[in-house]
Amino acid sequence: MRRGDTFNRRSRPGGSGTKRMSIYSARPVKLDKVRTYPLASRSSKVSVADFARVARRGANVREWVDSLPRILAGETFRAVVTALERARRKRKPIIWGLGGHVIKVGLSPLLIDLMHRGYLTAAAMNGAALIHDFEIALIGSTSEDVPAVLGEGRFGMAEETGRYLNEAIVAGDRAGDRAGNRDGLGVGEAVGRFLNQKRPPLRVGFRPYSLLATAYRERVPVTVHEAIGTDIIHNHPAIDPRALGAATHRDFLLLAALVRDLDGGGVYLNVGSAVVLPEVFLKCVSLAANLGRAPRGITTVNMDFIQHYRPTQNVLVRPTATGNSGRNPSRGYALTGHHELMVPLLAAALEK
């Protein structure tokens, strides 16, 4: 028997007289009855009208932004710029939630400029941002080489950082008692006050670079949200856990009031905090809803070099879900990129 005859006989599992190469019983579909339609009748998501334009030589930043594609991140960036400019015109809060990296990559001068221009009306910090800002105010530098000192037990043990931050917080907590009022100061206001003393216990040589110091002078609220055990000042003998807890709770209540006022066009930006500030912001929204109404018609923005779960859910999705209908719906936008590039670009794109 020929080899070919043997192969063909094995390839007829259904007993059909038609010779097939495949051993499978299922047969491929036929395309002769597929229905098509004219290309021009289709709804398409991309058009040449949305394409990038070549910016003219010597174009300013606004012209360059206008030249970006009106697609995906290009359109998202434009939408964030528009929301910030609209909030400033309407005198609505623009709150920046700041993680530690935002401060330690050198963006304080831009944040201070945004404050003076009306694009930062309040700031919320995690404990790392507080520490970096404080160290910059004192000596003009920050950020330890952790692997180099961790094994020696030296990580986080700088005397001035631990002692004077804790003492500032304790003094702020006790200020209420001296004033005949049980309410002391929050962490942000207490540290801002410390940095602006006429006769501080140590030299504050780089005060103009401190967001906390500048905000205090300008009466711009800064709140600090501590999670016990996450920051180096919690290792220092000068810590008063009761004062720290009370002060950071005051800051939470202050931020809740600021978040409530976002209603009707305010903007909240979470920049570089993956866990603490997104969780705090969500609780502020819930508290506002419980005491009256969740803020509606707001814009939330998450800026980071990776889009994490909690910022996505707790900043962009959940807080905007309660106000995403009507004439002025809430919106959430993700801008992905390095802080040291994205924040300067956003600051430059905003109208003066």
Language-model features, listed with the residues they occupy:
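Glycine-rich phosphate/diphosphate-binding loops that line cofactor/substrate pockets in enzymes
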Residues: 79-94, 214-218, 257-264
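A generic, well-ordered mixed alpha/beta core segment in the N-terminal half of proteins
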Residues: 106-172
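Short glycine-rich or small-residue beta-strand-to-loop segments that form or flank ligand, phosphate
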Residues: 93-101, 123-125, 267-272
